[in-house]
Amino acid sequence: MSIFETPRLILRPWKEKDEDAEALYKYAKDPAVGPIAGWPPHTSVGHSREVIRALLTYPEVYAVVLKETGEPVGNISLMFSNTAHTADIADNEAEMGYWIGVPYWGQGLIPEAVRRLLQHCFEDLDLQAVWCGYYDGNVRSKRVQEKCGFRFNHTEAGKRSPLGDIRTEHFMKLLRTEWMKDAQ
């Protein structure tokens, strides 16, 4: 699996070791982080370790690591038509998901990570489009997508989230041709 760098971040695979599990728990236990994205807060370091083992070791799943400290403070990932995803995507498309710990909200770190992963999507993976979704009320996620060039595609009401509740999800999409034009 690849490792990517930005001016302030390293995007690298999660490791099944105590340091990564502890860092994941530190930020994923906060009820302001997971539920708005559709997943429950983590309940222990052991729970976070199991999440790493079961979900975060897939290809194209990256810890968002601060270069300055070496600490994972969030996650960014790509999901394809043959893996879990919520958008109706074609074989040459992916869905991107991300989150970052509350202390790092508003610092532009996730847009920095998204832009780097988009470069990977279009230059290395030769994808034709990348999707992102956000639930009603998740204005921070919507703003990240807008800042990174995604455009509104459609809304799906009455969707069951991974938490089991019914929500409205909005989908945005960035085409390779749009990204290439904006990258010039």
Can you name each region flagged by the protein language model?
Residues 32-52:
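Conserved GNAT-fold acetyl-CoA-binding loop/helix
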Residues 1-32, 61-184:
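Acyl-donor (CoA/ACP) binding surface of acyl/acetyltransferases
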Residues 18-25, 45, 49, 53:
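An amphipathic alpha-helix signature
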Residues 53-58, 150:
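Short loop/turn motifs at secondary-structure junctions and domain boundaries
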Residues 48-50, 56, 144, 167:
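A generic membrane alpha-helix/interface feature
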